[in-house]
Amino acid sequence: MKIKQFLFAFAMILLVIGVNSCKKNDETVKEEFENTFQISADQAVTNNLSQDAEDVFLEIAQDYSIAGNFAPEPVNNIIPCATVTITPATGFPKTILIDFGTSCVHRGVTRSGKINITLTDSVRKSGSIAIMTFTNYFVNMYKVEGTYTWTNTSTANTRSWIRLTAGGRITAPDARVWTHEGNRTVTQTAGVGTISVLDDVFSVFPGTHTVTNSSNISRTCTILEALQRKVDCSNIDKGKVKVQGPNHYATVDFGDGTCDNLATLSIDGRAPRTIVLR
């Protein structure tokens, strides 16, 4: 009888340990899922902000006739609320300062602060390098920091760049902070033969990025389907990114080409959630 009682008690102990272990494991999995969800949403915002910085750079380069490929045109102040200073007036390398002041609203996007760029040669010339940094720079209340380096890899038939991000840091309007670094290949797919930048369309593929939150939890992000960014749209409107978790993954879907500020996020094929890009 004592042996039976002992075995029963021992079995109950194992059952309790097993239940508690499962509960802790479920809580851990749930926490990891939430970390992946938030980091995935953050990387989607990061993609948009990085592409936005590139759009501003290319618009200014075209407006001030330092893009190359076309004869010089009169300055049109394409971003009228920004003050642009380029030195020296002739020759390369050049230093470009884009000052948005305290509030510059252009095509529905509010910017403030400064973008600093050093440029080795005409933007569209193969081999040219542009290095961008930021001074107290905000886009729709997101603070953008880090160093972005563009290296022109264009050929006779293709206009493209490799974009490297080092020391990237984003502070959201709710004070959350995350860092990011990685590289992307950007190819222009429309508007190559026109002076206007408004018909330009860019495809971002391939590329990998690492995003780390304030708790030092990281996720690796890989482009599955090319991200599409039209200059006349404020957000990426097409493409997919895979975000790898410890034992799961998330897929961020930017849509079918419709211009809006939404994307969907699904973890391990579960029902997707909608996220706001910025």
Q: Where do the PLM segments sit?
A:
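Low-complexity, intrinsically disordered segments exposed to solvent
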Residues: 24-278
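Bacterial N-terminal signal peptides that target proteins for export
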Residues: 1-8
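C-terminal motif of bacterial Sec signal peptides marking the signal peptidase cleavage site
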Residues: 17-21
